[in-house]
């Protein structure tokens, strides 16, 4: 495994396919912005979206940051999505809803329940993409993948180890890929995302009907 400290850019030696080329029979196709574009399709309409923010921060101020960010996500979706704290989500909702999870496995219990089943592993200030490991408090990730509770539905992850970084995730230029790992340096100084700001890594997953996997580096 390659350990990469935050702020080190990965240049992947593999050639990533465009959207849809490696999907097989997978119903979900990504990328991140695809969730915002096609969630109103028939199979999405019958399974509404629930936005779940973590409540496990030590500081109540950080929990409020998560809740405020959940409202931002709802506004982007332009949908009557339900917003709930992680302690208030039922198993029925986890199985029947598309999930948007905000926080980390340490601060969001729903996130923690599915963390080992996600194609990218998020630990304590670490993010592992295939055989690449990023470390640092000032890093984060946006990712779309099948919902481990119901693989016909999606889970959209907004995660950062510093609440101040999470608060500004929408200033990171993202959407055209299935995932993006970023650092504080990826945040735009203005109100709009800056495509010239570097990410640590972004890419697509190898998509099979029941499993999505990131491309390993050689």
What kind of feature is each model-predicted range?
Residues 1-218:
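Solvent-exposed alpha-helical segments and adjacent loops
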């Amino acid at each position: 495994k390659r350990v990469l400290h935050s702020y080190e850019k990965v240049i992947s030696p593999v050639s990533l396919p465009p959207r849809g080329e490696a999907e097989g029979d997978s119903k979900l196709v990504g990328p991140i912005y695809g969730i915002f574009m096609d969630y109103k399709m028939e199979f999405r309409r019958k399974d509404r979206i629930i936005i779940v923010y973590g409540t496990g921060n030590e500081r109540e101020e950080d929990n409020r940051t998560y809740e405020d960010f959940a409202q931002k996500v709802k506004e982007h979706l332009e949908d009557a999505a339900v917003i709930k704290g992680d302690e208030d989500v039922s198993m029925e909702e986890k199985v029947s809803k598309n999930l948007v999870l905000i926080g980390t496995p340490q601060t969001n219990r729903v996130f923690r329940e599915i963390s080992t089943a996600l194609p990218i592993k998020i630990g304590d200030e670490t993010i592992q993409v295939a055989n690449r490991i990023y470390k640092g408090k000032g890093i984060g990730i946006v990712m779309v993948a099948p919902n481990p509770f119901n693989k016909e539905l999606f889970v959209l992850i907004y995660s950062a180890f510093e609440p101040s970084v999470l608060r500004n995730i929408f200033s990171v230029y993202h959407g055209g890929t299935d995932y993006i790992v970023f650092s504080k340096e990826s945040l735009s100084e203005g109100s709009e995302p800056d495509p010239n700001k570097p990410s640590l890594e972004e890419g697509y997953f190898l998509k099979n009907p029941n499993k999505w996997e990131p491309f390993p580096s050689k």
